[in-house]
Amino acid sequence: MKIRLHTLLAVLTAAPLLLAAAGCGSKPPSGSPETGAGAGTVATTPASSPVTLAETGSTLLYPLFNLWGPAFHERYPNVTITAQGTGSGAGIAQAAAGTVNIGASDAYLSEGDMAAHKGLMNIALAISAQQVNYNLPGVSEHLKLNGKVLAAMYQGTIKTWDDPQIAALNPGVNLPGTAVVPLHRSDGSGDTFLFTQYLSKQDPEGWGKSPGFGTTVDFPAVPGALGENGNGGMVTGCAETPGCVAYIGISFLDQASQRGLGEAQLGNSSGNFLLPDAQSIQAAAAGFASKTPANQAISMIDGPAPDGYPIINYEYAIVNNRQKDAATAQTLQAFLHWAITDGNKASFLDQVHFQPLPPAVVKLSDALIATISS
């Protein structure tokens, strides 16, 4: 399987941070987390002095940080959390450069990434998923698609929606002869990381060999294909482009539905087709809690659960375990602990269609949070 290694921006003054998957499916990376001078009990309350925590990165996580930030500030008025949706690649780059406290990411750092940048950690915050949407006026059914067919659509070998390969998955559906217009992210994106892992796993001899997967890949040059910035850009671009197919983070499910986009049932490794609802996401995630390593770098794509949705993931805070001062370190610990406990309640997660971390994974996240120091 070809893995694209993505060098992150000139903002990094040290060795380049490589955004590559270290494993796929049930063979995750393993290893121990970096520990710092602050290893021990997690701070559950922030410092009493005014502290601002800066977050940037994943547009999939951005709506959740927009819920978490004000709620934490209401509880602790001396703490301000700023959030920006810039894409996972930018979030990781800025966390590595030390320009933000939290780099939000749908993609995990591999062992190689963490070895190159001592102190950077993956801290799982919640469980998310990715949907595949399309713009086909007159088609009301949830079309069935799988990774091999989607790979052919993104490679340009399936050119129209009435192609026999799509029709074979959707008997009885009146498919139009509309041209397929693949949409992909133009920014470094954890959503691209997830989607291209799915294509690579289900089409290992095709997409898996080239272009492979990563936060940025060389998408095939397909006539009419479009690049869009962020999940919001993907929703808007697809809504304005009949025939489009697009991969979009589940926190934008409501926006996609409001714009009239269709939502696909995706095929998993058992040959079952599912929508990304709470039941199918939780079923897929259940088998990974005991397999999650201490450094939390694990692919959850297309796992073995027959009733599991195939594109799920942990959403991560990419954090350096050394912060600029004790007040920032304490406050960052307190906020991240709150995020995986109180912040994992349905009152927050249901608004973005996320699922809570299993208790075993909360313990792993807390162990990493406890290492944050100054």
UniProtKB/Swiss-Prot annotation:
Q: How is it used?
A: When used as a vaccine has immunostimulatory properties; it stimulates the differentiation of unrelated antigen memory CD4+ T-cells to produce IFN-gamma, IL-17 and IL-22.
Checking CDD domains in the record gives: PBP2_phosphate_binding
Q: The organism sits in which domain of life?
A: Bacteria
Gene3D superfamilies in the cross-refs: Periplasmic binding protein-like II
Q: Where is the lipid attached (S-diacylglycerol cysteine)?
A: C24
Q: Does the keyword Secreted apply?
A: yes
UniProt function note: Functions in inorganic phosphate uptake, although probably not the main uptake protein under phosphate starvation. Binds phosphate; probably able to bind both H(2)PO(4)(-) and HPO(4)(2-). Part of the ABC transporter complex PstSACB involved in phosphate import.
Q: What is this protein called?
A: Phosphate-binding protein PstS 1
- This protein's species is Mycobacterium tuberculosis (strain ATCC 25618 / H37Rv)
